[in-house]
Amino acid sequence: MRILITNDDGVHSPGLRLLYEFASPLGAVDVVAPESPKSATGLGITLHKPLRMYETDLCGFKAVATSGTPSDTIYLAAYGLGRRYDLVLSGINLGDNTSLQVILSSGTLGAAFQAALLGIPAVAYSLHAQDWEEVLKNREALEIMKAVVQKSAEFVLKYGLPHGVDVVSINFPRNMKRGVKAKLVRAAKFRFAQKVDRRVDPRGSSYYWLYGTDLAPEPDTDVYTVLVEGQIAVTPLTLDLNALNTDRKLDAEALAKLVRYINEAI
């Protein structure tokens, strides 16, 4: 089995290293990731300039850094390196990727969706945290993430994604401890109230910052599960945006099996 690992936080992110370490026992692993952070790039690909790839040593393992977006890395790995992948793992992202509002702009999910477009099963992992220093001190949380990554990846390699699912998004809560459980939940529509902050530079020209303020989480969604309940949200996603498609049916039994598979490990 060959696994491709990527992210949107950049090739030097601790989350990428963790994902590599967690996934390595499952098969041959390639790491191809952006050379610098590319958050909120969604499914964006680079068409207006050439892309570069170069090998880099990340203190014990080799990775390929690219000048492109997370979505570009999928194309470059599949076609530039000419390799065939059984699974793509994207993450572990610093910051949760909950709600459709965030999912549709996320580079972490963008890479996973790009893999799905190429017919490769994909799982994206994100963590509700503000800095890696806090996370890396929590050995209990690291062991939980390791178990979830290994079991979810193992499940997809063994059984494939459940029918009707193109990507699985897994969001970890902050400060996880033993007893935490994975829950199968849908994505909320919104996570933030969108804001624009207009400012004026010393020359009198306007410039703008985009930001958001937290909304009250909607129950029975990924946002509520992670932020309020402190549990792990497992959210199946589909690429099919066609409103006229009434034929797509989810394999609920297989999805429930995936969550059981994860919970048995934590």
UniProtKB/Swiss-Prot annotation:
Its cofactor is a divalent metal cation. Keywords: Cytoplasm, Hydrolase, Metal-binding, Nucleotide-binding. A divalent metal cation binds at residues 8-9, 39, 93. One of its GO terms (molecular function) is nucleotide binding. InterPro entries: SurE, SurE-like_Pase/nucleotidase, SurE-like_sf. It is an enzyme of class 3 (hydrolase). Its EC number is 3.1.3.5. It comes from the Archaea. The keyword Cytoplasm applies. One of its GO terms (cellular component) is cytoplasm. Binds 1 divalent metal cation per subunit. It catalyses: a ribonucleoside 5'-phosphate + H2O = a ribonucleoside + phosphate. Its main location: cytoplasm. It is found in: Cytoplasm. Belongs to the SurE nucleotidase family. NCBIfam families: PRK13934.1, surE. Nucleotidase that shows phosphatase activity on nucleoside 5'-monophosphates. This is 5'-nucleotidase SurE.
